[in-house]
Amino acid sequence: MVKLRLKRCGRKQQAVYRIVAIDVRSRREGRDLRKVGFYDPIKNQTCLNVPAILYFLEKGAQPTRTVYDILRKAEFFKEKERTLS
């Protein structure tokens, strides 16, 4: 099973996260299938690759709670509803 989850990057005290599609059995820093976004909690910046995220969600990938909250905050699911209608 594939999940969309955060992968920690950056330096000490300056965490930056990549949003990645990764197998559930892999550890947090393990090899990801694909990078689908970027999240910087310090600068409050988010960058999403919408087609890649849609692809993985259609294939059955489950976002973690934190990734789901980031996508919801970026109004991702409103865009998804617009593309489906």
Swiss-Prot record:
Gene Ontology terms, MF aspect = structural constituent of ribosome
- Chief localization class? plastid
Where found in the cell? Plastid, Chloroplast
- The reply on keyword Plastid is yes
GO BP, sorted A to Z: mitochondrial translation
UniProt xrefs under Gene3D superfamilies: 3.30.1320.10
- Family matches, as Pfam families: Ribosomal_S16 (PF00886)
Q: What PROSITE patterns does the record tag this protein with?
A: RIBOSOMAL_S16
Q: Which UniProt keywords apply?
A: Chloroplast, Plastid, Ribonucleoprotein, Ribosomal protein
UniProt lists the family membership as follows: Belongs to the bacterial ribosomal protein bS16 family.
User: This chain belongs to which protein, by name?
Assistant: Small ribosomal subunit protein bS16c
Q: Species lineage, top-down? A: Eukaryota, Viridiplantae, Streptophyta, Embryophyta, Tracheophyta
